[in-house]
């Protein structure tokens, strides 16, 4: 029985890893839409990256998963030399176009885990709403590519509870339960800012980096039905749905936005930044 259990656990791990690899590649299928609708990050976040990381003026930055350059452009505008590693070839093509005015930026197509990168070559590693796709087995590589006193800055836009949404995200749960019950789960409402999980726990446990300093930057976005559905169409789990199920789900959501929320909803976000020095 013990051997059977180990076999089942190995099979589950392999399935989880295969699903992770499948989902993280989905964004390239909608690269143009991703570029059009994915949000950036508050200006204050970039100011704090500089202050907390100690990255020098004109310093060398490695960005993991640049997408189409949502976070790259503000860093390029600050004069840093940036090497971007992006898994999706279509995303990388758009990123190169968006960053064409900045010869200090290079966009490579590849996965961080396997991309050949020089050791001790960067002052800062950054990743914007992408680091959760990195395989933990490659965490030591983060430390190897950094210079002494180098740092890592990881940040995400997170959807949190807020009175500004008028209860919309509670109201759409029956639509998810009807059309995509595997997404609904046990809905207990959106988390508050204080209830968000620590995205750096696994990395911190390696001991490769010093204690993380955390910055939080709340902001809101407003969407009509089409804009909100476009946003959903850039989420890997929605992209993985069969087209007919996704369409029924989206029809139900659009009908609620237009019929019960006056054609517009507001979404409360918080950008969360984690910065630590390499040890």
Language-model-detected regions and their locations in the chain:
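Class I SAM-dependent methyltransferase SAM/SAH-binding core
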Residues: 62, 68-114
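Conserved catalytic/acceptor-binding region of the Class I
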Residues: 147-218
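A short acidic, Gly/Pro-enriched loop at the edge of an enzyme's catalytic core
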Residues: 114-124
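A short SAM/SAH-binding and catalytic strip from SAM-dependent methyltransferases
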Residues: 123-137, 158
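Nucleotide donor/acceptor-binding cores
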Residues: 58-59, 120
